[in-house]
A protein has these predicted regions:
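Bacterial N-terminal signal peptides
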Residues: 30-44, 49
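Short, solvent-exposed loop/turn segments enriched in Ser/Thr/Gly
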Residues: 69, 80-86, 161-162, 173-181
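Glycoside hydrolase catalytic-domain groove-lining segments
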Residues: 394-405, 409-437
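Catalytic domains of carbohydrate-active enzymes that cleave complex glycans
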Residues: 305-311, 319-356, 360-393, 481-607
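Active-site clefts of carbohydrate-active enzymes
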Residues: 423-454, 473-475
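Short solvent-exposed strand-capping/beta-turn motif centered on an Asx-Ser/Thr pair
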Residues: 78-80, 90-94, 103, 172, ...
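Surface-exposed binding patches on compact interaction domains or structured appendages
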Residues: 51-70, 92-165, 174
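Aromatic-lined carbohydrate-binding surfaces of glycoside hydrolases
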Residues: 90, 136, 141, 148, ...
């Protein structure tokens, strides 16, 4: 199949001759003629610069990006995998349309989504990154195939406008090659180019039920509520629908919210809960039955501010009573295997670690009454000996912590202790956020290449890390406090802490209700970002690595692929060191490593 470019005939601008008179003495007729010539020339230039081209999902097209040459789409995907690609158009103010031709395969047409890639304006670059102010592509605002759209429009710069085409391959799809044609009309009313882009999708003969990497992304219900119209009643069925769509979107991206946002009624004094009503409200999100969201990982509602406020000092018996009832409910509902307790954050002082010890032992005592051990997550690092300063030995926690969640920049100085804890059956997660080492570490900031989001899955497989925690997902509040309202479409600066400035590290999605961009449904799911799509791609690519390792010779194949991605590895030692691995900046290298794994896995499957 070859792409076809059709242009309506354009009338050439008329020739002009040099005028013998000086400009100051132009006649009215001459001035009119000159104006007409200029207008026609500008129109001709606009048409000449108009273009349609294709770039990979992980690339970035800026407002000033020049047209490329590629006009074909060639994707491949496993069962239950999502794959994206960007189609860019360039030109002045006009209407464009993307649609499927009638000969396109239903698998592609029925499972494809279209988004326009909008730009956000970074005015304060992320600290220590070395990036520049300017317009960055990020939010993926949903659009409909077949609908005409005005671009660039008054709310975003141009002349280049990217669109994001995302295809999902349902698990169980027959392997093979599927084709379609994506028709791009670059100026619907003005006679611009019409490009038929050949679209090829290869479906591999393997797949997965869900992403196996564990996760916890802090979703703010307060910020979500502030993003909705003032007259919207965020309660009852309205609230349930908003949360269902939000959590479903997260599930589709292979990640989980920390807490499901319904809390039980609790007696402050005794810790007794009002059972039943709360559990019935969260069941549609936590259950694995048909029609339920099936959130993969969940934080049991035992928080610094719930069921007791920070100023209260509940007795151990009250805490034990509450946790006994809650862990029993989780066991009876079948949620206990996905649940964890996470009540303290970054316990750097000995007194804080002793408090964690107390909470963990109460939680384990409570869950033991229901015949299991609920996992206790702590954002701390295991230390068999003192490392100086506040980093004293904490082996007294070894039997209490089930999920050690290490800050990424500490991890590479804790590997010996981490491996010892893994041999003892403990989970290891990474805790990521932006700091002064942002240039060296993977980060979710907007003004850094999307490789950073994609590499997480590969890095986690390389270092045998079970999960990832990020302390913000929709932090649409003030960058200093998180309170109030910040429009992330217009102000991407999501965090100010001391001298640190960060764009988007705690804001991976955008409000799904945003009439300015044509999003007028309050219950809609949040808007994804190029960064979040790349995170999912990396987590899906980790599934390739894990599947390959289960096959004869697959361990070697996985190791070879990882070496192409991770270009240097720091020395292993237990010390306060901050040496980090390096990784390729080439998306083509990622793509080649992924495809090599896919071809190996497919060849090993029974015919």
């Amino acid at each position: 199949m070859h792409h076809r470019i059709r242009r309506r005939p354009q009338e050439a601008p008329p020739r002009t001759r040099a005028l013998a008179v000086r400009p100051a003495r132009l006649t009215a007729a001459g001035a009119t003629l000159l104006t007409l010539v200029v207008v026609l020339l500008l129109a001709w230039v606009a048409v000449a610069e108009a273009a349609v081209w294709v770039i990979p999902a992980a690339s970035r097209a800026y407002p000033s990006t020049k047209a490329g040459a590629r006009q074909t789409i060639d994707l491949d995907a496993a069962g239950n995998e999502y794959q994206g690609v960007q189609v860019c158009v360039r030109g002045g103010d006009r209407k464009v349309r993307l649609s499927w031709t009638t000969d396109s395969h239903p698998l592609i047409v029925d499972n494809a989504e279209l988004s326009r890639v909008f730009y956000v304006k970074v005015t304060t670059p992320t600290t220590k990154l070395g990036s520049r102010p300017g317009w960055y592509p990020d939010p993926l605002v949903p659009r409909d195939f077949g609908a005409t759209q005005s671009v660039p429009g008054s709310v975003n710069p141009g002349p280049t406008t990217p669109f994001y085409v995302l295809v999902h391959v349902p698990l169980g799809t027959v392997p093979g090659e599927y084709t379609a044609t994506l028709r791009v009309e670059n100026d619907v009313a003005g006679g611009g180019e019409v490009v038929d882009v050949p679209f090829k999708l290869r479906v591999w003969n393997f797949g997965w039920q869900q992403i196996s990497t564990r996760s916890a992304f802090a979703m703010s219900q307060d910020n979500l509520k502030r993003s909705l119209p003032r007259n919207f009643n965020f309660a009852g069925q309205n609230k349930a629908e908003v949360l269902r769509n939000f959590y479903t979107m997260m599930k589709q991206h292979g990640i989980s919210p920390t807490t499901v946002h319904y809390l039980p009624k609790v007696s402050d004094s005794s810790g007794a809960t009002a059972e039943g009503d709360w559990a019935n409200k969260v069941a549609p999100f936590l259950d694995e039955t048909d029609g339920a969201v099936g959130v993969q990982d969940t934080q049991l509602p035992f928080l610094r501010w719930f069921p007791w406020s920070r100023s209260q000092r509940p007795s151990s018996s009250a805490i034990l009573n509450y946790l006994t009832q809650m862990t029993r409910e989780y066991k009876e509902r079948g949620w206990h295997k996905k649940a964890y307790i996470y009540i303290l954050d970054e316990t750097t002082k000995r007194s804080e670690e002793r408090q964690a010890e107390r909470y963990a032992r109460l939680a384990h005592k409570a869950s033991a009454r229901s015949g299991y051990r609920i996992k206790f997550l702590l954002t701390d690092d295991p230390r068999p000996r003192s490392l100086g300063g506040v980093k004293t030995a904490n082996t007294f926690l070894y039997d209490d912590v089930d999920i050690w969640t290490l800050r990424y920049y500490y991890f590479f100085g804790r590997i010996p202790a981490v491996r010892e804890r893994q041999r003892a059956g403990k989970e290891i997660w990474w805790y990521t956020y932006t700091n002064a080492s942002v240039r060296k570490n993977p980060a979710f900031v907007i003004d850094k290449p999307h490789i950073d989001s994609r590499v997480w899955g590969w890095m986690m497989e390389k270092w045998d890390v079970d999960g990832i925690l990020n302390w913000g997902f929709n932090r649409w509040g003030k960058p200093t406090t998180g309170d109030g309202w910040r429009d992330p479409y217009r102000n991407p600066l999501s965090l100010i802490k001391g001298n640190l400035r960060s764009n988007g590290c705690t804001s991976l999605v955008y409000p799904g209700y945003y009439p300015r961009y044509g999003l007028d449904r309050p219950t809609a799911a949040p808007v994804s970002s190029l960064r979040l799509e790349m995170l999912r791609d990396g987590l899906e690519e980790r599934e390739y690595l894990r599947i390959a390792k289960t096959l004869p010779g697959g361990g070697t194949r996985a190791t070879t692929a990882l070496k192409k991605i991770i270009t240097s590895v720091p020395k292993v030692r237990q010390a306060n060191v901050f040496n980090f691995p390096t990784y390729t900046s080439s998306n083509a290298t990622f793509d080649a490593a992924r495809r090599s794994l896919a071809e190996f896995i497919e060849a090993q499957q029974p015919q």
